Amino acid sequence: MLGNYYFAIVGHYDNPVYEKEFNQQMKMDSNDHRHLNQFIVHAALDLVDESMWGTTGMYLKSVDKFNEWFVSAFDPPLSWIIDPQFFLDLTSWMRFMMLHDVKNDDGIKNFFSDVYETFIKVLMNPFYEINSKIKSANFDKKVLLAAKKHILP
């Protein structure tokens, strides 16, 4: 489906851990547009936190709408990764957020699932510091492949 997509992984302290924009031309938009995307996603975080209590699934489709943009989210269960002897509140630990201008629920859900599998591998890396930015070129490439497979034509 043709459309514009902005994907972000938001950390425990509402910090951006990873960001990626996808559009028809596969080029980055201006900085102003990027800041607007970040603002819309950040504004929708409270709605995601409220919505996750009303469902048993991890995928939350169209949690919010801003003009022509929809916000979808994926709230993965990550508590099993941390050693159980340490207590951390992981109920709102990491959230995957997608800002998009076309309805593509199945594609976005499948994209989230593929990226989640790759994200788990990043978290299992002993050199990755939890809640820090993901700078791996390999992770970036796998996210792009998942996008081409599920949300881009």
Curated annotation (Swiss-Prot):
| Keywords for this protein | Cytoplasm, Endoplasmic reticulum, ER-Golgi transport, Golgi apparatus, Transport
In Pfam terms, one family for this protein is Sedlin_N
Instruction: Please indicate which superkingdom the organism of origin belongs to.
Output: Eukaryota
Which coarse location class describes where this protein primarily resides?
Answer: cytoplasm
**GO BP terms, alphabetized:** endoplasmic reticulum to Golgi vesicle-mediated transport
What's in the GO CC field?
cytoplasm; endoplasmic reticulum; Golgi apparatus; nucleus; perinuclear region of cytoplasm; TRAPP complex
Can you say where in the cell this protein is located? Cytoplasm, Perinuclear region; Endoplasmic reticulum; Golgi apparatus
Subunit structure, interactors included? Part of the multisubunit TRAPP (transport protein particle) complex.
Instruction: Tell me the protein family, please.
Output: Belongs to the TRAPP small subunits family. Sedlin subfamily.
- Kindly give the PANTHER family that the UniProt entry links to this protein: TRAFFICKING PROTEIN PARTICLE COMPLEX SUBUNIT 2
What job does the chain carry out?
A: May play a role in vesicular transport from endoplasmic reticulum to Golgi.
State the protein's name. Probable trafficking protein particle complex subunit 2
